[in-house]
Curated annotation (Swiss-Prot):
This is Serine/threonine transporter SstT. It is found in: Cell membrane. Involved in the import of serine and threonine into the cell, with the concomitant import of sodium (symport system). GO terms for cellular component: plasma membrane. The gene is sstT. SUPFAM superfamilies: Proton glutamate symport protein. It holds the Pfam family SDF. The keyword Transport applies. GO terms for molecular function: neutral L-amino acid:sodium symporter activity. Gene3D superfamilies: Sodium:dicarboxylate symporter. It comes from the Bacteria. It comes from Streptococcus thermophilus (strain ATCC BAA-250 / LMG 18311). It catalyses: L-serine(in) + Na(+)(in) = L-serine(out) + Na(+)(out); L-threonine(in) + Na(+)(in) = L-threonine(out) + Na(+)(out). The chain crosses the membrane at residues 17-37, 44-64, 78-98, 138-158, 179-199, 212-232, 295-315, 336-356.
Amino acid sequence: MKRFISAWNRTSLIKRIAIGVVIGAILGLLIPKITVIGLLGDMFVGGLKAIAPLLVSALVANALSQTREGQQSNMKTIIVLYLFGTFAAALTAVISHYIFPISLKLGAASATKAAAPQGVGEVFKDLMLKMVDNPINALSQANYIGVLVWSVVFGFAMRTASEHTKELLHTLAEVTSQIVRWIINLAPFGILGLVFDTISKNGVGVLADYGVLILVLVGTMTFVALVINPIIAFVMMGKNPFPLVFRCLKDSGITAFFTRSSAANIPVNLQLCEDLGLNPDTYSVSIPLGSTINMAGAAVTINVLTLAAVTTLGIEVDFATAFILSVVSTISACGASGIAGGSLLLVPVACSLFGISNDLAMQVVGVGFIVGVIQDSCETALNSSTDVLFTAVAEKSRWKKS
């Protein structure tokens, strides 16, 4: 038994999740009436639901508190590129939704249609009210918009705090991330339960829906990596960006694909920046910062899953509302890619814009974890490779002007 446990712990999380998916599907076909197996999925989603608001608060506040006033102009350019690139990716995901609308198989609760907001005006009003919610109430009631806003406020306020105070905030973020890592390590069992529950209730045909979801997610991220990012790079540099784009994807993206963590890929990116001959004073700051706030892949994941949930519930979304969704997903993604699967835990933030309950939003998160073996790897590859790309683009743009 000890040998089995040791071998299990040595196996990568990706392989363990894949094993959970296979076993869950087999059990769902063979013994669909043993519903207690689905309890594993309910407990896993419950754990995520419990820690998600605190995770958003801690990571966002910590990330913003670490930014320094008076950064050199090149650093400001990189930050603008990070944020604009993330927003462009979010908008690309919205457009892909209109071209390839997809729906999900959710639980029985989805049979009751969510109250659809009456256009952008109602969405904006609801957004404003959620922003000024009591911060403690926002955490306890999983009001992610309120959590996000207060985290941003506290994060900026903490920029002028003492280093000791910032260290406490950083420690809180680390502790919260560690708890999330413990929960994520239980993902194979939770996903086994989720897949079992899905297959036993909906049959094998539901797997085709997941296949379409994976194609839309990966296709959108590929479009961002090979079309959107090169366009941004060309505008900044004024020359062919593809040699640099492919170098970043090859040397950074491939490694990030397997680590599934932008934070874990920081040493690889720092070495790549050195190989590219970039300014160490710049990339020593921009790469760690990018692993926290440069979230193109996360923005794609959040928007695709949110809009899939919206389609499933029959909610009509105009483009103005979808544009607000892109802004919200860009901001809320701050801090997500430092941990494996972090972007999925931010889907409820975006879902709350459309009046989707936290229970339904967490079902969507569960679907995200089922496809996460591929989604999270591709997302991290896009996020991490873009850190180096935009750092290099900003510096080469300065060289062009000098």
